[in-house]
């Protein structure tokens, strides 16, 4: 996920990433995304530019219509985002896909993030009452 056509990306790196995409294009068991040269604002700006140049009347554009112009339109919304290194910000990371995400913050640095940390984050996520923008349901 990102702008591989950016001239600042070394050609050998670009070729290797595209080869990896081709080699894994028909895999169906796991979805795995690498954010490389990715910026959320750049993705949204690109999507808006493509939508405006497209056949759809932008005043009638739905979320599903707009999604078609994102880098990975088939990528589902992110349910859980684990932010390592104690940073509590998105840092321009997938603004469209994280609109209703749950966040878990950890002081653990990414290179030190192990399976136990992952399971702990998932366990915390499982305690959440997800509303996806809706009001909290009060129990009577």
Q: Predicted regions span which residues?
A:
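Flexible, compositionally biased loop and terminal segments
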Residues: 1-140
